[in-house]
Amino acid sequence: MITGIQITKAANDDLLNSIWLLDSEKNEARCVVATAGFEADQVIAASELGEYESRDVAIEKAPKIEGGQHLNVNVLQRDTLEDAVKHPENYPQLTIRVSGYAVRFNSLTTEQQKDVIARTFTESL
């Protein structure tokens, strides 16, 4: 388990007010920030911190889920895309986001255009 601490009192003055992530499973300490003596991201054995007093620091740990979420934001009206399918000559510069890439709507196949419309506009969340 990883916990965050700020050292408030220590025999080693370099540790004073430094912030650390303690990994109890590996018995390691990772420096988040220190004014002297330690570098950010430096990993040492937890025992090297010596005796100290500390306060807990809230930490946020990023989820380790593969895949995650992806959001493409297109700010436009459904009618605009539907009209672009019917009259592509009126929308030569219409650009949308698809899978993280900017693409001209007219360069997509009709099937892809309809898929974009279906996925972009929903009745409710």
Swiss-Prot record:
Family annotation (InterPro entries): Auton_GlycylRad_Cofactor, Form_AcTrfase_GR_CS, Gly_radical, Glycyl_radical_cofactor_GrcA
Keyword Disulfide bond: no
Entry keyword Cell division: no
Matches recorded under Pfam families: Gly_radical (PF01228)
Modified residues (Glycine radical): G100
Annotated ranges, domain Glycine radical: 5-125
Keywords, sorted A to Z: Organic radical
Cysteines joined through disulfide linkages: none
One term under GO cellular component: cytosol
GO molecular function: formate C-acetyltransferase activity
Function in brief: Acts as a radical domain for damaged PFL and possibly other radical proteins.
Protein's name in the database: Autonomous glycyl radical cofactor
Source organism per UniProt: Aliivibrio fischeri (strain ATCC 700601 / ES114)
Top-level taxonomy: Bacteria, Pseudomonadati, Pseudomonadota, Gammaproteobacteria, Vibrionales
